[in-house]
Amino acid sequence: MSSSPSEMTSTLLALSNNLADAVERVASAVVAVNARQRIPSSGVHWQSGVIVTADETIKRSEDITVTLNDGRTVPATLAGRDPSTDIAVLKLSDVELPVAQIGEATSLKVGHLVLAVGRSDESGLNASMGAVSALGGSWRSSYGGLIDQFVRIDLTLYPSLEGGPLVDAMGRVVGITVSGPRRTVLAIPATTVNRVVAQLLEKGRIARGYIGLGMQPVHLPDSLKSTLTLNSNGGVIVVNVEPNGPGDRAGVLIGDVLLSLDGTPVSDTGDVQAMLGPECVGTPVSVQVMRGGALTEVEILVGERPRRGE
């Protein structure tokens, strides 16, 4: 039996009110972040005195301000940033502000309605509704950052919403909304944010591994794969070796083709970067190398990627 028009109206009104209530629950903890030209981004009061936002929206390290729910604009200091997970942490001093209720992205299901919430200096609170379009397991970004869960959202991400909270139907913050590749919208899950925030507050940075090599993808001809009995179609060819860097000290040469790291095949530079997470710094990695048409093994002691400006 089909629903009557009045029943459908009542259902839609109830859904609309519930979503508005979800926005209202987080609204007082959402701030506008002024750290780039023209359009501000958003952030959320994650814990006492700590604002979390997207690193990609932080275009300067000084003269940062945030606009609160009551309209006040106050200074904020950059406590730390991690481009690999797209998380930046700002600190506030002597500011009373409600803390958002933090949930878990693991509670989400494909098809669940979610809301990207933000704040701008001009229009105040704003939101965009969408649905969870894809979920997955843990993954590494192209810069080596470990993300605990893959969460893709189908919604319109206006510039003022970037870096703001993604909330579920209960108004709980389940992640930070960021721009993904090819105009996708992703959420950095709350578990990842908690881990990154704790490390940034303690150390101001997160170590990332590097091997001091400039590389680019290369395709291997079938004849060579057959001769060397290789399963992979390609690897990464070394086009630059940083003097006295980890690769140089291990004896890697320009023209070497890296085929695998610790037994895991690599086919592009993103594969290599993704395997050099914080846990790799200071540890050796076994690299299968093709040199002069022959295979050899090289052990590289992974170094720490220099910070920006170093």
Which role does the model predict for each range below?
Residues 1-2, 36-40, 46-87, 92-95:
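Catalytic-histidine neighborhood of serine endopeptidases
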Residues 1-3, 8-11, 21, 47, ...:
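C-terminal recognition in membrane/secretory proteostasis and scaffolding
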Residues 11-22, 29-48, 54, 72-75, ...:
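A conserved glycine-rich beta-strand in the N-terminal activation segment of trypsin-fold
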Residues 27-29, 93-101, 126-182, 190-195, ...:
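Active-site region of chymotrypsin-like
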Residues 30-34, 51-55, 108-120, 153-156, ...:
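Active-site-proximal beta-strands of protease catalytic cores
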Residues 37-40, 60-61, 158-162, 235, ...:
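Short, small/polar residue-rich loop motifs at catalytic or cofactor-binding pockets
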Residues 38, 48, 59, 81-85, ...:
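Short, conserved beta-turn/loop elements at beta-strand boundaries and strand-helix junctions
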Residues 60-78, 95, 109-116, 125-140, ...:
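Beta-strand/loop subdomains of soluble extracytoplasmic proteins
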